[in-house]
């Protein structure tokens, strides 16, 4: 959940300060780093309502990246996005995973699964099943 009364920079600053960061220059540098990583450079003074849905989602991902997590859990991260924004989020997750962070995503969007095949697990009648999506799709 984004803080609607704070701009992009302040949303990220809040998380860093809440997790123990104290040095203002280090905070500023870390914010610049994650904004660059998620493609929101020059948006630091925009309010959340001034961002598109895709940009808001990128800001949420930036918040998740601030403290260099080993795992990101994403629940329907492309659910309310147009196809172009959805594709951008999926490409961003692929880049994040390529940098060594595991991304676990819950989705009902079969198009994303088809376009970005990877290890896929589904819940079926209370059971967890791993699906070989690559062979199913013929890749």
Regions found by a protein language model. Give the residues of each.
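H-loop/switch region of ABC-family ATPase nucleotide-binding domains
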Residues: 107-108
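Short coil-to-helix segment of the ABC ATPase nucleotide-binding domain corresponding to the Q-loop/switch region
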Residues: 6-14
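Conserved ABC ATPase signature
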Residues: 47-51, 55
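Catalytic Walker B motif of ABC-type/P-loop ATPase nucleotide-binding domains
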Residues: 72-75
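Hydrophobic anchor residue at the start of the ABC signature
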Residues: 61
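Helix N-cap at the start of a conserved alpha-helix in ABC-type nucleotide-binding domains
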Residues: 83-85
């Amino acid at each position: 959940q984004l803080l609607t009364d704070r701009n992009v920079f302040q949303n990220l600053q809040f998380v860093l300060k809440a997790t123990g960061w104290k040095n203002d220059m280090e905070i500023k540098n870390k914010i610049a780093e994650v904004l660059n990583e998620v493609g929101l450079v020059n948006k630091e003074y925009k309010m959340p309502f001034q961002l598109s849905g895709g940009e808001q989602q990128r800001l949420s991902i930036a918040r998740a990246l601030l403290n260099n997590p080993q795992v990101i859990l994403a629940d329907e991260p492309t659910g309310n996005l147009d196809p172009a924004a959805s594709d951008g989020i999926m490409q961003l997750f692929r880049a994040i995973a390529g940098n060594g962070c595991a991304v676990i995503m819950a989705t009902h969007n079969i198009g994303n699964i088809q376009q970005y095949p990877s290890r896929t697990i589904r819940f079926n009648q209370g059971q967890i099943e791993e699906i070989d999506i690559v062979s199913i799709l013929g890749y």
